[in-house]
Amino acid sequence: MDDSKKRTISRETLEAVKSKMNPVLLNALPASPEEILAFAQRRTDPVISKNIDRNLAEKMRAFRLSDEDYLMTLFMAMGDVFYNREQSENPTASILLAQTGAGKTNLRTSLLQKNPDTIIINSDQYKKFRPDAEAILTTDPTHFGALTGIDSYDHASNITDFAMAHSYDLLIECAPSLQQGLIGVDLEALKQAGYDTKFHVMAVGDLISALAIHLRYEHELALGRPNGETKLTDLKRHNESYLALEKIIKELDAEAVSIYRRGTEGEGRRPIKICDAKEPSEILADARAKSNEEYIKTGGFRRDHKLILEAMKHRRAPQLQQDQLAEVYKMFINYIEQNQEL
């Protein structure tokens, strides 16, 4: 497996896609379909995390879109992402770093208020445009994120490359990987393109985020609006991204790193920047531990866990999802045993 090997999509495929797409959608693109085609590159042999079991990895490869569907999905995503956005004279790149379920969405909202022209790079946001998104959500909701992951990461890479070539401000959301590092972030390319790059890190304990991926999923299902962004993240992926951030933050320029904690209810739940003279890795570790402790002491974990259990029972959740929640509860018990004062 080698993420560096990529291939392009043919002009014949482009013409087929153009003939099937609504002219209004084509007109909404930030450049001509022909220009965008040059950025529509796909990995030939994508790297898949070692934490993914062999059967699921094979299914992920099997669910890759055809070139025609891939290009059509890219066009629809770009029409949405670049709508009413302006290019920048002095482009900036804001890199949002956190494990899955840590609350990157709230931090994203806060940063976008300062610069609404920013292009959001978030692979989950493009999945809803896949022609098979609804079918996958219906037949295998547990693995929706994984089955659509290869194409969505490639779409994110295509959109990033286009945005950089045209000097758009960027906001890249990343749940890092031990194997792949800052997925979708090429720091050297950003530097070469003249971007001022800053890192914004959410410091949230693993008990909170591991349960949050379940709570978020149940909330979306309860509202009756599952879509391409509705997924139950695999717990192994969550745990890997949690550990990866500990490693990666030590390699970043401390001057370019800002760390945030989750805001309380009295603070409007907005992310609060932590001002501390310590090294970023120390700030991250301390804030994570403190958030876990508060979550346990205030009864938050048991309350949310009970709520999720009731929701799962009500909808007769698949056994795989129940098993994953049981693993999260084991994490909680282990944490209690290792921290007797709690």
Where are these regions (language model features)?
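Conserved nucleotide-sensing/catalytic segment adjacent to the nucleotide-binding pocket
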Residues: 118-188
